[in-house]
Amino acid sequence: MILAANFKMNHTRASTKAYIERLNAYGKQTDIDIAVFPPATALDQYETFADIGAQNAYAAEHGSFTGEIGLQQLQEFGIETVLLGHSERRHIFYESQEMIARKFAFYKERGFTIYYCLGETLQTRKKGFEAIRELLQSQLEGIDTAYENFVIAYEPVWAIGTGVAAKPEEIEEVLAYLASLTDAPLLYGGSVKPANIKEVLSIPKCDGALIGTASWDVENFIKMIEIAKEMR
């Protein structure tokens, strides 16, 4: 079971440090892996059982890439996990599949654990599952689905940050399809919160959750870890 907290553009260095300290005080739970993705300004070499990852990184060690961080910056803090393909990177920052695949290849070559996001818009959802399947295939172009340090997070765009999670049967259908393509752990993301995480984690083929808004409060996140622990 994997529970990952994506801070997005939230938290500071001080509040991230306090968050990690609270997680450490709570302690590692058997059979539940925890990942935390702080903003770039809060990345550090924290003493923690949680896997600390970058929300984004450029496909280069260093160089003239204004506003980006690369391998050199991540290595300073011992970061070996990166989140790629998030819909906010795709739709707000116009990252192409070619760019995402290039990042994937770069960090795969360096053995990083890669959390890879994909998912459909509401417009595609309304067209039916065949359209969803075609979109997911396009979002896997150039991606090595057999990579051993690979985690997929299915995040329907219309459910991210809206408070409206996808229905269990909708999630199950997509995860079953993804499971036919890869042996990688499959997470669901999209308005996951304490009120629905048990239902989400009960879905066949669901190996965990990538959690946004509901994870920003550490007590909320711990509450979700507790629910997951009770289900083991």
Curated annotation (Swiss-Prot):
The keyword Isomerase applies. One of its GO terms (biological process) is glyceraldehyde-3-phosphate biosynthetic process. Its EC number is 5.3.1.1. Pathway: Carbohydrate biosynthesis; gluconeogenesis; Carbohydrate degradation; glycolysis; D-glyceraldehyde 3-phosphate from glycerone phosphate: step 1/1. InterPro entries: Aldolase_TIM, TIM_sf, TrioseP_Isoase_bac/euk, Triosephosphate_isomerase, Triosephosphate_isomerase_AS. Transmembrane segments: none annotated. Pfam families: TIM. PANTHER family: TRIOSEPHOSPHATE ISOMERASE (PTHR21139:SF42). NCBIfam families: PRK00042.3-2, tim. This is Triosephosphate isomerase. It comes from Nitratiruptor sp. (strain SB155-2). The gene is tpiA.
